[in-house]
Amino acid sequence: MILNCPHFQQQDCVSCQWLEKPYATQLTDKEIDLKRLISPFILQNFTEILPPVQSSQKQFRNKAKMVVSGSVERPILGILKDQTDPQSGIDLCDCPLYPTEFEALFPILKDFIARAGLVPYNIAKKKGELKYILLTQSRYNQSIMLRFVLKSEQKRPLVERELPNLLAKLPKDSVVSLNIQPQHAAILEGETEIFLTEKTTIEENFNDIPLFIRPQGFFQTNPNVASQLYATAQNWIKDLAIQQFWDLFCGVGGFGLHCAKALQEKNENVQLTSIEISASAIASATKSAEQLQLKNITFASLDSAQFALNEKSATPDLVIVNPPRRGIGKPLAEFLNQLGTPYLIYSSCNARTMAQDFEALSNYSLQKVQLFDMFPHTSHYEVLTFLVKKS
């Protein structure tokens, strides 16, 4: 086994299903899978398949999602081995994927749970308050986003009473919030977010691009690999003749901001339109662009497919897509195929749906492919591709 993990050895936690596979074999298996899926689109003497970008094998995650079980005096942070049995809690505070700083944090959180009387939610009895603790760390300044997922606001006064003591033990610039999830269902978070700190975002920084992480927003879980992913996209397009481009499914702006910064260094009139359905992610991306003093950038909180299908302005020179696992879907893929933009960048966490989308992009040739091992010890991976319009 490449990581010493007692939880895997005892089969208490098997999230890392490939933990017994040597890391080199993991990478090879992922490459084989990727090449099999995209083989119809690989062109001899044209498609460049670049070497995979490797990950650290431990402590690479910036995030922990902990189910809270046990008792208020002795809370267990980790997972339930049996989703229907509240007594089946497995403590994962020593998970080797978490940053080293989390180790000192978990005892502080357990103490806080006891002091604030946050009784762990019992799924069998439908009683208790605290369902999950969600933690995210910035590698840039070690600040923490700490979210307590509760059944109701009932314990808020006690939490606020104990908060100053907790904040004194957390890194500077940390964010603490209560997320209210009243449903008796295995749903990670509810719609209501109550901030207990003045700050509502933590700052990350990849390649001198500030990125802001908010509750309920998507952010890559492997910062070292993610920063290389964005830098690679930036490198692929920085010398191309691009006047305007779109960044669809833009999230907090990682791809678009990296590319805009590089392109505007040569031509300040380059225009970027970034589209993302999540309003809070767009707020984060806007904040980043302001801090970078980038001009000619338009952000909109819209459905990416709806935006593209209804957009009547000039054809962009580049379109970047970074969709969720379901892919961009046939209507958007067919539209982009007809739109005729010279260049496409497609970043995917699901090569199967990406390959399906490629079938509709028949006017394009696959020029570059690179695998990014965002999710070591699992079968999942990220892939970055560059497509050019056929002449």
UniProtKB/Swiss-Prot annotation:
Mind listing the GO molecular function terms for this protein?
Answer: 4 iron, 4 sulfur cluster binding; iron ion binding; rRNA (uridine-C5-)-methyltransferase activity
Residue positions annotated to bind [4Fe-4S] cluster are C5, C13, C16, C95
Does ATP-binding count among this protein's keywords? no
- What broad class of enzyme is this? transferase
The record lists the catalysed reaction(s) as: uridine(747) in 23S rRNA + S-adenosyl-L-methionine = 5-methyluridine(747) in 23S rRNA + S-adenosyl-L-homocysteine + H(+)
Query: Catalytic positions?
Result: C349 (nucleophile)
**Could you say which residues bind S-adenosyl-L-methionine here?**
Q220, F249, E276, N322
A Pfam family assignment: tRNA_U5-meth_tr
Family annotation (PROSITE patterns): SAM_MT_RNA_M5U, TRMA_1, TRMA_2
EC number annotated for this UniProt entry = 2.1.1.189
Coiled-coil annotation reads none
The reply on keyword Lipid metabolism is no
**Which keywords describe this protein according to UniProt?**
4Fe-4S, Iron, Iron-sulfur, Metal-binding, Methyltransferase, rRNA processing, S-adenosyl-L-methionine, Transferase
Biological processes per GO annotation: rRNA base methylation
Q: Kindly indicate where the leader peptide sits in this chain.
A: none
CDD domains, sorted: AdoMet_MTases
Q: Sum up the protein's function in the record's words.
A: Catalyzes the formation of 5-methyl-uridine at position 747 (m5U747) in 23S rRNA.
The record's listing under HAMAP family reads:
23SrRNA_methyltr_RlmC
Q: Which PANTHER family match?
A: RNA M5U METHYLTRANSFERASE, TRNA (URACIL(54)-C(5))-METHYLTRANSFERASE
Query: According to its UniProt record, which protein family does this protein belong to?
Result: Belongs to the class I-like SAM-binding methyltransferase superfamily. RNA M5U methyltransferase family. RlmC subfamily.
Protein's name according to its UniProt entry = 23S rRNA (uracil(747)-C(5))-methyltransferase RlmC
What is the organism field in this record? Actinobacillus pleuropneumoniae serotype 7 (strain AP76)
What taxonomic lineage is listed for the species of origin? Answer: Bacteria, Pseudomonadati, Pseudomonadota, Gammaproteobacteria, Pasteurellales
